[in-house]
Structure formats: C-alpha cells, structure tokens
Amino acid sequence: MKGQEARGEEPPSGTVAARRLRRRLDSEARILAAAEQIFAETGFSGATTAMIAAKARLPKANVHYYFRTKRQLYQAVLQRILEAWLASGDGIRAEADPATAFTDYISAKMEASRRQPYASKVFANEILHCAPEVDDYLRDQVHRWVQDKARVIDRWVAEGRMRPVDAPHLFFVLWAATQTYADFDCQMRAVLRRRRLAPGDYAAGAALIIRMVLGACGIRTGNGADRRRVTQGAERRG
C-alpha cells in the first residue's frame, strides 16, 4: 500500500491505507487553509506554526509532521494557488473557441478569488516584496505558461479570430482585474457598504471583464461568429 501512495495511486476504498490517505489529505487541506489565512493576516514574519495549528484545530506536532518548517508551509501555500491559477488556463488551446476559452479562464480566475482570497493575498504580499520565494517559479513555469498561451493567441490572430494584442500584457490585465476581488476586497466592501462581497458581485465583475476583453480583442460570440475575420476597418471602428 505504501508503494501505491508513493506512486500517487489511491489505495482500494475501505482499506486501512485508504483511510490513512484520507486522514492525511484532510489534515493537509486543513493546515493549508489555516496557513493561507494566517499568512495573509500577519505576513510570513508574523506567523507562527502554533498560530496555524490553532486555526486548523490540530496539534502543532501535526503541522510539523506534514510541513517540517514554516517556510516549507509558506511555499506550499504559494505553489498551490499558482498551480491552480495556471490550470485555470488549460482551455486556452489553439483548437478552442477564443470566446469560450477567455470566458472560462476569466470565470475560473474570479472563482479562485472568491474561494481562495487568503491565498491570493499571500501571493500579492509576496510580489510586493519582489517575490523572494517564487521568483524562480515565475521565471520558469509561469514564463513558459505565458509563452505557450501567447503562441495560441498569435495563431488566433493569424486566423482572423481576434485582433492583434500583446499577449503577455493581456494576461497582466486579466490577473489584475480578477485578483483584485481578493487582494483589495476591503476597498470594494467599503465602497459598496457591505460586510462581505456577495456571489453576485463576483459574477457581475466576471461578466464585465469578459465583455471588455472580448470587445477589446474583437472576438465575436455565438454561432461561430467569433471565427469571422476581424478586418482592419473593424479594428478602427472598435
């Protein structure tokens, strides 16, 4: 059974190994969720594993069993949100419909801001400090991800399915527009005079961002219309 876990295979349901795996995954999830909130509220320097254990309602020894150091736990929080953000763009493929691909990506990024606001804030704080823990990840995985998606967008442009855009800067805009609903939610709550943002706020924000992006990129929707060639004249009218 240990060999199965090491290979990433799930043991048969109901076995001792399966129950052990479920407990491990549950404990790790609780620790990571607690760590997201503590790191977001206190920063890396202000956080302690004792605070995280208390938030997770687990013994401190359990935290150190799964994550040997506070830094390792902090890196795990950052890696988890970064991997989720990159995975949300899996639909941006050459054979995909541009309107659907961007709609799904923006919706997924906004949902991440709604469901994991603390993780987003941890990342934002990391970036404000020049990304000491994720600089290599940004220069490697994120760089390659952006270059891969840029090639897809360039192909869509060449096929006349959207207007020419600077793809990396398009993603910078999308990241800022969606992540602000997590990173600066207190600003929005104050302006809207609400204790917390409602699901409708995220939906309204996503809908607006989608309309703006599709419009600016000259992507038509419905009945394959987005595949029609975007002419220079249409670009000037936009």
Sequence positions of predicted segments:
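Hydrophobic alpha-helical connector segments
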Residues: 90-121, 159, 167-174, 203-206
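C-terminal peripheral helix-coil segments that are non-catalytic and often amphipathic
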Residues: 1-15, 108-111, 115, 143, ...
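Hydrophobic/aromatic residues within well-ordered alpha-helical segments
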Residues: 27, 70, 77, 81, ...
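Amphipathic alpha-helical segments used for helix-helix packing
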Residues: 114-136, 184-193
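Short acidic/histidine-centered micro-motifs embedded in hydrophobic/aromatic stretches
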Residues: 122-126, 140, 173, 177
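Helix-turn-helix
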Residues: 30, 38-72, 76
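Amphipathic alpha-helical linker/stalk segments
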Residues: 75-104, 152-154
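Short hydrophobic clusters on alpha-helical segments that form packing/core surfaces
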Residues: 31-39, 109, 213
